[in-house]
Regions:
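Structural signal for hydrophobic packing residues in well-ordered secondary-structure cores
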Residues: 13, 53, 57-61, 108-112, ...
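Carbohydrate-associated surface elements
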Residues: 97
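Flexible glycine-/small-residue-enriched beta->alpha junction loops
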Residues: 104-110, 154
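Gly/Ser/Thr-rich active-site cleft segment
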Residues: 2, 115-174
Length: 174
């Protein structure tokens, strides 16, 4: 979510939670430079994930080498932009940011209600593509440096693996 990063260690055989931790211990910072704007620093997500993971491992006394799989759940519709070196170019525009709604409304009008509601199941006003259109128009110097865009969970996966990819459900977020 946008308020903290949570790590849980689950026994795959029993399905029981062995340990769980979250960081930061107070609500995560949301940067709101203007009304309707909401951004977070993706690097803070990564740092908080490392802290939460360390706490879970310490509490459970499980050796990290014994962990067989990692699952990632995350806030939707956040836009993370990275350069060719996988460095974050700007704070992520997160799900509750509404600055790009006019871009989404234009897409809704261009694509048509039928397409949007039957394929997207929603108006694209708050979707990732609308946020990217906002950056293109309002921050062209950032836009020119973008190598890849991703969702918050994809950023964490990139930090864990070094690979930039997404999921089928991530692709559906528009």
């Amino acid at each position: 979510g946008s308020s903290s990063v949570k790590a849980s260690l689950v026994n795959a055989e029993s399905g029981k939670c062995v340990s769980s931790a979250f960081f930061p211990k107070t609500e995560a910072e949301i940067i709101a430079v203007k009304p309707g704007w909401a951004e977070q620093n993706p690097e803070n997500w990564w740092e908080n994930l490392k802290l939460a993971t360390q706490a879970v491992l310490a509490d459970s006394r499980v050796d990290a080498a014994d962990i067989k799989a990692i699952g990632i759940s995350y806030q939707m519709h956040g836009l993370v932009c990275v350069d060719k070196d996988q460095h974050v170019l700007r704070p992520a525009i997160i799900w509750c940011d509404s600055r790009a709604v006019p871009y989404g409304q234009k897409a809704f009008e261009t694509l048509g209600e039928e397409v949007c509601l039957s394929h997207l199941l929603n108006s694209p006003g708050n979707f990732t593509a609308s946020k990217l259109a906002w950056i293109k128009e309002n921050e062209p110097s950032v836009y020119e440096k973008i190598y890849k865009i991703m969702l918050p969970g994809d950023y964490i996966a990139m930090k864990l693996s070094g690979s930039i990819c997404t999921t089928v459900s991530g692709l559906s977020e528009g």
